[in-house]
Amino acid sequence: MDQQRTGDLNWRLSAHPITLLFFLGFRIGSLLMYLFGVLFISDFVLVFILTLLLLSADFYYLKNIAGRRLVGLRWWNEVNTSTGDSNWVFESSDPNTRTINATDKRFFWLSLYATPALWIGLAILAIIRLQSVIWLSLVGIALILTVTNTLAFSRCDRFSQASTFASSALSGGITSNLTRGVFGRLFR
């Protein structure tokens, strides 16, 4: 019989299965509502609103809950009221106090990068089929929301890895950390 290992794409191996199911549910739900909503609901406006609500729920849930629970990353935007400058703030859990489940990590990053790619494909399809502008605007909104989360979490992950590398380099052998980092990336 096939033995399941941590890191396999099986939601039962998740450390946070409810969080993972809601995360994937919002992501898949918005795509399915966009693709098949008109087959079950005759009112276009209702399909548009339901898709928009699912996209908004996905954005909020990923940004504030799933990112923190599944991979220990969180981001937000702060605006300086006196100057009007906007700064992105990244937060990551301490790797010494929290271990990230490999299954959660795989689901998170795979879904994070696959969803914008699917929406880009749907945008190209909408342009080729010359659908109404309103459908294309919905895809545009979906792209803005999913790409924003993708870019923010990618930056947050890079920031997290850089700060972990810097702190471990100061406390231990920099050569072993550099070697481990290079070979770890190549053979992951």
UniProtKB/Swiss-Prot annotation:
Glycosylated residues (UniProt): 80, 101, 177
Cystines in this chain: none
Keywords: Glycoprotein, Golgi apparatus, Membrane, Transmembrane, Transmembrane helix
Locations listed in the record: Golgi apparatus membrane
Recorded topology in the membrane: Multi-pass membrane protein
Keyword Membrane: yes
GO BP: protein secretion; vesicle-mediated transport
Residue stretches spanning the membrane: 13-33, 35-55, 108-128, 133-153
Main subcellular location of this protein, as a coarse class: Golgi
Keyword Cytoplasm: no
A GO cellular component annotation in the UniProt record: Golgi membrane
General function of this protein: Golgi membrane protein involved in vesicular trafficking.
Family of the protein in this entry: Belongs to the TVP23 family.
Name of the protein: Golgi apparatus membrane protein TVP23
Species this chain originates from: Coccidioides immitis (strain RS)
Organism classification: Eukaryota, Fungi, Dikarya, Ascomycota, Pezizomycotina
